[in-house]
Structures are given as C-alpha cells and as structure tokens.
C-alpha cells in the first residue's frame, strides 16, 4: 500500500507541467524525464501535441525534418541545439515503463528573436484611387537582460508615428482586432499602423511612397522599408488584366458565333451544290421513265392490232371455206 502511494505521488509530480522557459536563438535546451532508463520500455516525444519521435531501447525513429541535424533523442531526454525562433512551442515526453506505468514530462519553450514585420495591404481600390494600410509589428524581441529605453517609429520623412517603450498604449490583441491598454511588457504584438492614399496619375516625388519602420535602443537598431505605391500599382495592373479579360470575352463569343454562321453557310452551300447536281439526274430519270412507258404502250398497241388482224383473217378464211 505504501509503495503504491509513493508511486502515485511520483507520477503526479512528474505529470506537473513546467512553466514557460525563455531561450535566445542558438541556445541549447534539454528536456528529460526522471524515470530510470532501465525501467523504460519506450518513449513518445511530442511537439505541439504531434509525435516527432519514438525512442526504444534499440533505436529512435520518426524525426521531423527540421530537427534532424539539431536534435538528439533518447529514452529519457530530448536535446535541441542551436535553437531557432520557430522551435518555440510545447514539448512533451511520454515514457511507457515496463511495469505499465506511464510517466509524462512537459516543457513550454519560448525562443526569443528580433523579428519585426512591416507589411502593407490595400483597403480600398478603384481605377484611379488606392488606400493602403501599413503596419509594423513586433513579432518577437530578444530582451537580452537589462532593458534600455526602446523607441519605435513608422512613417515617411514628413509624416510618422512615434512609440516609446515602456507604454500602455497600442497593445494589439488579435482576438479583439483592436488596440487596448495593458501592461508594457512583453513587447510582442505591439504595433503601429498608418494609412496612405495614392492617385494613379499623380506621382509625388518627395518620398511619400517610401514607408520606414525603425526600432532602436542604446544597443540595438532595426530598420525596414516598404514602398506602398508599388502595392497599389500591382493591384491596378491586376484590375486592368481582369477588365481586359472581361472585355475580350464578348469578342471571343462573336468569333465563335461568326465561325458557327460560316459553318452553317458552308453547309447550306454544300446542300445547294448537292441539289444542283441532283436536279439533272432527276430529270433524266423522269425522261427515261416516260420513254419506257411510251414504248411499252406502243408495243401493247401493236400486239393488240396484230391480234385483231389475225382474228379477222381467221374469220374471213372460215367464210370462204363455206
């Protein structure tokens, strides 16, 4: 009874989920179970609830491709070297012991990296007018220990937005699709947005097309540029292509109609030609039939006359004999 209680306590302890542990890019991480390797029959390793490997006493199989060169997996441990930002997630090892007990250990890993996105999307478009929303968002940022004051700027030389850190403003919540007030850190999901409008036939040459996103502190700086007008020009070109395709459809239809009309005319001409050839043939046949009929009638008449003549001759001969 005491042994079972201790075993249950150990299992509950091992099932406890570790908190999120933060690492920097290129760090190494090790996740291990506390079970004795001699007691383990096999272990399944999971990444975001998907099996990435099966470890047995003899071998390990099932590595996912992105881990092949950077991971070492055994019955008891999962070691990842040279961490990448995309390695962030939940890791879990499920060990099946030889006595039937299942031991689980988990760890949530967050890999910090300096990833800032600068994107633009068209909000409104006509043949001559285009409105673009430019967005600069911090996807991830490596704090690297102590924080020096950070600053974020988005805009053009003449028009820009400024965001100092820490701040309670401009916290973007994806689920709510809006900005809310909140704690200054972590700075992930913090973003600045600015809108710009362009006229297709009016080109301004004072760098109003170029939008820049700056993120800088005492020991770090980031700069990325985006030409918003190029986005509009691509959309205008696509709009023109669609219109050209639409306008060409009736022409193609007319061509098909003309082709069909030509085919029908050709068939009609062929029929007319056939009728022209067949007309003489029908007249000749009719003449032949008439001639044959007339000849037959003449022959019948001759035969009848001959019979009558023979009858009269026979009758007169009989009278003379009397």
Swiss-Prot record:
It holds the Pfam family Pox_I6. Residues 1-20 form the signal peptide. Coiled coil: none annotated. Its main location: host cell. The chain crosses the membrane at residues 287-307. Induction: Expressed in the early phase of the viral replicative cycle. The keyword Glycoprotein applies. The keyword Transmembrane applies. Keywords: Glycoprotein, Host cell membrane, Host membrane, Membrane, Signal, Transmembrane, Transmembrane helix. It is a single-pass membrane protein. Belongs to the orthopoxvirus OPG049 family. This is Protein OPG049.
């Amino acid at each position: 009874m005491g042994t079972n209680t201790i075993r249950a306590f150990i299992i509950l302890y091992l099932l406890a989920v570790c908190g999120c542990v933060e690492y920097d890019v290129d760090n190494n991480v090790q996740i291990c179970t506390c079970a004795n390797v001699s007691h383990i029959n096999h272990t399944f390793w999971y990444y975001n609830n998907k099996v990435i490997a099966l470890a047995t006493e003899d071998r390990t199989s099932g590595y996912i491709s992105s881990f092949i060169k950077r991971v070492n997996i055994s019955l008891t441990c999962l070691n990842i070297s040279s961490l990448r930002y995309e390695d962030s997630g939940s890791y879990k090892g499920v060990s099946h012991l030889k006595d039937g007990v299942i031991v689980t250990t988990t760890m949530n890993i967050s890999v910090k990296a300096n990833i800032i996105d600068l994107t633009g999307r068209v909000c409104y478009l006509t043949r001559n007018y285009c409105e673009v929303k430019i967005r600069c968002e911090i996807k991830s940022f490596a704090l690297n220990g102590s924080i020096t004051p950070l600053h974020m700027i988005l805009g053009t030389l003449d028009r820009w937005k400024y965001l100092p850190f820490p701040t309670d403003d401009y916290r973007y919540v994806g689920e709510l699709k809006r900005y809310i007030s909140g704690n200054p850190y972590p700075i992930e999901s913090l973003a600045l947005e600015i809108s710009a409008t362009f006229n297709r036939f009016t080109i301004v040459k004072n760098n109003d097309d170029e939008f820049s996103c700056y993120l800088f502190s005492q020991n770090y700086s980031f700069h990325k540029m985006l030409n918003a007008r190029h986005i509009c020009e691509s959309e205008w070109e696509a709009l023109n292509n669609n219109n050209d395709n639409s306008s060409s459809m009736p022409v193609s239809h007319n061509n098909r109609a003309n082709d069909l009309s030509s085919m029908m005319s050709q068939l009609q001409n062929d029929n007319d030609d056939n009728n022209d050839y067949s007309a003489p043939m029908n007249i000749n046949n009719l003449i032949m039939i008439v001639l044959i009929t007339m000849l037959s009638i003449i022959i019948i008449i001759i035969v009848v006359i001959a019979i009558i003549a023979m009858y009269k001759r026979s009758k007169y001969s009989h009278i003379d004999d009397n």
